[in-house]
Amino acid sequence: MMSTNFQWPGTNKNDNTEVSVETPSSTDPHVPRYPFTAMSHATASTTMKKRKRDDFDGDKSTTITMNTTTTRKYIQSSLGSSKFKKAKTPKISGQPLPLPRLIESLDKSNLQKLVQDLITVHPELQSTLIKISPRPSIQDSIQLLQDKFDMIISHLPYKCDVESDYSYLRIKPHLQEFLSSVSDFILNYLPPLETNMTHSLQFLHETTKLVYNLPNFTNQEFQYTKSSALEQIANCWLIVLSQDEEKEGNTDVVKVIQELELLEKLHEHNEISFNKFEKVVDYCKDKLEQHELIMNNNEAGSGVTSSISDLITVDYSKYSIANTTSI
């Protein structure tokens, strides 16, 4: 009995005849009972051995390749790291400017603020700074006062009377700064600190012009301040001119008065300041008159001496050594 829809190979579904197939006898000992099965097992065993050998060879080749690749990568990474170490630069970090370079980069206002802050923090350095700092020249001192004077003029109001109280109050802080600077610089050019009379008088002359060229404000406070300032400056003129007065026969003052033409300049200052410099003018006149009197007396004395020497004549030939020996 056969299953439906199933047939053996070589059979016809519609044919009911049986076909006999001759097979070797199962009783023959020389013939394998399952020849195809034996061959199949031998072939499979050989194939498996070959596959194992191929797999082993492949694994070995893969292992060698992987080892070679790993070694090459290690060598390359070692070479790369060694090159990187050779090219490596030291670490650089930011740092402030050295003090000389920092001072060099500062402008005038910042440098001035730096010194003032330094004195505020360390007040004991004030005397040292005064001692080691160079003295300003006359030109620099006058220029500084001129700048402060210009600051006063630049702050005057445009649409207002220049001499009014409003104008004065507006420039008052700058006026106070100017007069304070004048006082400080005048003291710097007085003896015995300043030994050169010419320098002192030149500075006083320029400073006096700046003071009386200030706007003539009608404010009473300003008028009093300006008058007092001119009186003090006139006294400083006398201090400078009389510094060597104790020296007997001193002609330096007269020489300076003549070379600088001080008498003419003082006349101008006295006229503009309403006779504030009258004492200075009288002092210079007195010095010039004394010098002229001394010069006239010297000339007169030299003339009298020459006339007396002309009247007294002695013949010294009789008292010569030759005449004495001949006797």
Swiss-Prot record:
InterPro entries: Cut8/Sts1_fam (IPR013868), Cut8/Sts1_sf (IPR038422). It comes from the Eukaryota. It is found in: Cytoplasm; Nucleus. Residues 1-28 have a biased composition (Polar residues). Disulfide bonds: none annotated. GO terms for cellular component: cytoplasm; nucleus. Coiled coil: none annotated. One of its GO terms (molecular function) is proteasome binding. Pfam families: Cut8 (PF08559). One of its GO terms (biological process) is nuclear protein quality control by the ubiquitin-proteasome system. Its main location: cytoplasm. Keywords: Cytoplasm, Nucleus, Protein transport, Transport. Residues 37-47 have a biased composition (Low complexity). Belongs to the cut8/STS1 family. Binds the proteasome. Involved in ubiquitin-mediated protein degradation. Regulatory factor in the ubiquitin/proteasome pathway that controls the turnover of proteasome substrates. Targets proteasomes to the nucleus and facilitates the degradation of nuclear proteins. This is Tethering factor for nuclear proteasome STS1. It comes from Candida albicans (strain SC5314 / ATCC MYA-2876) (Yeast).
